[in-house]
């Protein structure tokens, strides 16, 4: 059984230090000179939607564990072009309660398929400029195969099942809402 932390805000300056992330750290026991076999740590699923810039390093640190030898990441960023048009930013919208619920289901699926320890899924909302991260998924596991496969499954499932919409904003002052061809509700269009 895993604990779940869901937040609609990102790291504020007050929460940047590890000691101030109590809600996350309270779920894990810190090793204090004990034998590695004595370390007790509850698995965590951390889901967050935010309008703030994502820190890949901070998200990856949330899943680090003394019980794990691997942390695998997926980082989705805004690229500067689409079909010959210059993209200046993306704008994301989501139905957050449903999106959180769908991501929770994805985390549960991952735990049924792979022996992973912690899962973090962070997604930006609002404007995301070129080269900035819109999605960060981090998974820790004892060995790399499980976390690598879980991260791949997580992003594929997120794109297929989670109600998040993306608008591309182009340099020539036009924009276009993009249909996600992978999502189940758009199939057959």
Curated annotation (Swiss-Prot):
Q: Name one Pfam family in it.
A: MoaE
Question: What ranges does the record give for the region Disordered, renumbered to this chain?
Answer: 1-41
The pathway this protein participates in, as annotated, is: Cofactor biosynthesis; molybdopterin biosynthesis
GO cellular component labels: cytosol; molybdopterin synthase complex
Positions carrying Phosphoserine: 20
What are the protein's UniProt keywords? Cytoplasm, Molybdenum cofactor biosynthesis, Phosphoprotein, Transferase
Q: Which residues form a coiled coil?
A: none
Q: Can you name one GO molecular function term for this protein? A: molybdopterin synthase activity
Which transformation does this protein catalyse, written as a reaction? 2 [molybdopterin-synthase sulfur-carrier protein]-C-terminal-Gly-aminoethanethioate + cyclic pyranopterin phosphate + H2O = molybdopterin + 2 [molybdopterin-synthase sulfur-carrier protein]-C-terminal Gly-Gly + 2 H(+)
The protein's location, in the record's own words, is: Cytoplasm, Cytosol
**Biased composition range(s): Polar residues:** 1-30
Biased composition (Basic and acidic residues) is annotated at: 32-41
EC number(s) stated in the UniProt entry for this protein: 2.8.1.12
Q: Please tell me where this protein is predominantly located.
A: cytoplasm
The enzyme class is transferase
Q: Which GO terms describe its biological process?
A: Mo-molybdopterin cofactor biosynthetic process; molybdopterin cofactor biosynthetic process
InterPro entries xrefs: MoaE_sf, MOCS2B_euk, Mopterin_biosynth_MoaE
Q: Which residues bind substrate?
A: 143-144, 159, 166-168
Q: Quote the record's miscellaneous comment.
A: This protein is produced by a bicistronic gene which also produces the small subunit (MOCS2A) from an overlapping reading frame.
Q: How does it assemble?
A: Heterotetramer; composed of 2 small (MOCS2A) and 2 large (MOCS2B) subunits.
**Family from the record:** Belongs to the MoaE family. MOCS2B subfamily.
HAMAP family cross-referenced by the UniProt entry: MOC2B (MF_03052)
What name does UniProt use for this protein?
A: Molybdopterin synthase catalytic subunit
**Native organism:** Mus musculus (Mouse)
Lineage, uppermost ranks: Eukaryota, Metazoa, Chordata, Craniata, Vertebrata
């Amino acid at each position: 059984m895993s604990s779940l932390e869901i937040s609609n805000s990102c790291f504020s300056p007050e929460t940047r230090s590890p000691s101030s992330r109590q809600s996350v750290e309270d779920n894990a026991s810190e090793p204090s000179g004990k034998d590695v076999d004595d370390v007790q740590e509850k698995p965590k699923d951390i889901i967050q939607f935010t309008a703030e810039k994502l820190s890949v390093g901070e998200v990856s640190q949330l899943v680090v564990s003394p019980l794990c030898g691997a942390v695998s990441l997926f980082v989705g960023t805004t690229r500067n072009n689409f079909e010959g048009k210059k993209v200046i930013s993306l704008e994301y919208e989501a139905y957050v309660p449903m999106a959180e619920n769908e991501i929770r289901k994805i985390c549960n699926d991952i735990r049924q398929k792979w022996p992973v320890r912690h899962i973090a899924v962070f997604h930006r909302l609002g404007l995301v400029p070129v080269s900035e991260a819109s999605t960060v998924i981090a998974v820790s596991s004892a060995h790399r195969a499980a976390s690598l496969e879980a991260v791949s499954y997580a992003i594929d499932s997120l794109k297929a099942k989670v109600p998040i919409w993306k608008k591309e904003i182009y340099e020539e002052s036009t924009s276009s809402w993009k249909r996600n061809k992978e999502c189940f509700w758009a199939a057959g269009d």
